[in-house]
Design a protein with these regions (language model features):
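Active-site core of glycosidic bond-cleaving carbohydrate-active enzymes
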Residues: 1-124, 129, 155, 162
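C-terminal beta-sandwich/jelly-roll accessory domains of carbohydrate-active enzymes
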Residues: 129-168
Length: 168
C-alpha cells in the first residue's frame, strides 16, 4: 500500500510544468478535476486505508473548484458528470467502480440531505457537527447501528433509512 500511496500523493503535490494545456482545468498538483474520468481518484485514498486524505481533498475540491455563479464549474459538465460528482460527494460517498453498486465513503458537505425513493421510502444523510474545521468523519451509523465498512451498497441506500456521520 505504501508505494501506491506515495504515487497517489505525488499526483496531488507535483506541479504540472512545461507546455500550457489550455483544456486542463481544476488542477491540484497534476490531478485535473475538470477532467471527469479522474473524479474517482480522490476516493482511492479511502480504499487504501487513508480516508482522512480523501476527506481533505474532497473539502479542498468543494472549496476551490465549485462556485455559486454561472461559470462556477472547472472544465465543463459533460453529460452532467461534474454535477454528479458534486451531488454524490456532498452526500459523503462516490462510486469508484460504478458497476459494483458500492459507494466509497468520503466526507459529507451538507448537514442534512434526504433522498426520496420508490414506494415512499426515504434515505436521510445527517452530518453531525459539520463545519470547515470539522471535515473529518469520526464515525458512521446506519439506522442507529455502528457502520465500519469503507463502502455502502446501493442496496442499503434504496432500502431507506438514516446514515449519520459524526464529524470531528
Amino acid at each position: 500500500e505504501e508505494p501506491f500511496l506515495n504515487k497517489l500523493d505525488s499526483l496531488f503535490t507535483v506541479k504540472l510544468e512545461g507546455e500550457s494545456l489550455s483544456d486542463v482545468t481544476g488542477l491540484i498538483g497534476q490531478y485535473a478535476h475538470g477532467n471527469e474520468p479522474s473524479h474517482h481518484v480522490t476516493y482511492l485514498y479511502a480504499l487504501a486505508g487513508r480516508p482522512e486524505r480523501t476527506q481533505e481533498l474532497v473539502r479542498e475540491i468543494f472549496d476551490t473548484q465549485y462556485k455559486n455563479k454561472p461559470d462556477g464549474l472547472c472544465g465543463n459538465d459533460d453529460c452532467g458528470q461534474m454535477s454528479a460528482w458534486y451531488m454524490l460527494s456532498a452526500m459523503g460517498f462516490y462510486p469508484v467502480d460504478p458497476v459494483s453498486a458500492e459507494y466509497v465513503f468520503g466526507a459529507p458537505q451538507l448537514p442534512k440531505m434526504t433522498l426520496h425513493l420508490a414506494d415512499g421510502k426515504t434515505f436521510t444523510i445527517i452530518a453531525e457537527n459539520l463545519s470547515k474545521e470539522h471535515k473529518y468523519v469520526d464515525s458512521i451509523t446506519l439506522n442507529g447501528e455502528p457502520y465500519t465498512k469503507k463502502t455502502i451498497s446501493h442496496e442499503d441506500i434504496v432500502k431507506g433509512g438514516t446514515l449519520v456521520y459524526k464529524m470531528k
